[in-house]
Amino acid sequence: MYLEYLQPKLNLMDESSTISKNFPDYSPNLNTPITSNFNEETGSDCSLVTPRIISSSNSNSNSNSNSNSNSNSGSIDENELNNSNSSSSSARQIRKKWKEPEDIAFITTIMNNSQLLTFVEYFKPMKNFWKKISKILFQQYGYERNSRQCHDRFKVLYTKSLKVHPSKKSKQKKKKSKQEAGSNLNFDPSKLSRMQYLLVQLQNTFSFVNGNIILKSQKTLKPNKNGTNDNINNHYYNNCNNNNNNINNSNNSNNNNSNNINRNSNHSTNVFSTPEHIQSSINLDKLESLPALDTKGEPSFISPAQFSLLSSAPADNLILQTPPSPFFQQTMPIQLPRDAQQEQISPVFSTDVIYMWQTMFNTIENLKEQVNCLKNEVKQLNHKFYQQNKPLHNMSTSDSENFMQQH
């Protein structure tokens, strides 16, 4: 009896295993309680024979609801992604294209500020140079570009300049025919537009190596050894003759001024009158016309001891006598020997040195004349001061003697 009761239960377990294999979504409800509905004819329980099976309609509805929920969530996510992409694209800065007026302003700014590359702070790192260029571009022309955009645009313009100038183009391409090389010689810069002309100037001024802009050095023309030395020497000797004539004229004028001073000192009787020799001896035009001298580079030709000796000298010696020196005794400029070594020396350097020494010699001669004039004025003023104080001194001594005699 007990075995007959358990037989349907075992059959039910076998059926559930087969159904689960065939239908993966099927899940039998094993939580139903075992009741006493026992059929004596069949020997089985009705509640156990007919198990509860989930209806397909419910499963379909659940699957539909799950799919709908998934689809709704997916649509929401897509909308959120679209909104985020649109907001990020609107917030992203759009790079404007460079137009020709902006390119012209950019090249002009670089050409005008090319000397910044000679300073270390703008060359290392190069980023400082492009920051300065972008700042000047905005201040002068109103175009707002950052340093990275300026660097990239220069690279593009430099490659364009290689295509504009045919001589540069021929250097890069090694395989060219002779006809193309001959056509490059007929290059006419007057036929270029303003933009093309600026590109050629950009190519001639800068070089672009490994992302760094380098300022090209200015080329200096070397003179010929045959004709230039003779011309320079002739020009040098002409200048020497002119300078000697000027020195002689200045010496003659100095002698005339000293003679006038002596005459005025002999004929001056009124002690309290204004000395006229001071006005005649001082030449204000000569003082203003002298160039400014650098005292650090000039040798001191009057020492303090010599100045004290000169100040204590008698009033008769009205001309300043400078100490003997080979520098002041030189009346002719230095003449360099012309030999094989002279040809090796650069003529520009030699003429610069000669001109420098000649100008120094002329200025020192003019200063000597001025010092002589000032020394003469000081001596004349000291002489007049002594004459003015002499009667006062005599009066004071006589009064003191009378006072002593009375008392």
Swiss-Prot record:
The Myb-like domain, residue ranges: 90-158
Gene Ontology terms, MF aspect: DNA binding; GTPase regulator activity
GO CC terms, sorted: nucleus
Gene that encodes the chain: RPI1
Function: Negative regulator of the Ras-cyclic AMP pathway. Negatively regulate the activity of normal but not mutationally activated Ras proteins. The down-regulatory effect of RPI1 requires the presence of one of the two Ras GTPase activators, IRA1 and IRA2.
General remark: Present with 1340 molecules/cell in log phase SD medium.
PROSITE patterns named in the record: MYB_LIKE
Protein name in UniProt: Negative RAS protein regulator protein
Lineage: Eukaryota, Fungi, Dikarya, Ascomycota, Saccharomycotina
Signal sequence annotation: none
Biased composition (Basic residues): 165-177
Native source species: Saccharomyces cerevisiae (strain ATCC 204508 / S288c)
Keywords: DNA-binding, Nucleus
InterPro entries: SANT/Myb
Biological process annotations from GO: fungal-type cell wall biogenesis; positive regulation of transcription by RNA polymerase II; Ras protein signal transduction
Subcellular location: Nucleus
Amino acid composition bias (Low complexity), ranges on this chain: 55-73, 241-270
Region described as Disordered: spans on this chain: 51-94, 165-187, 241-273
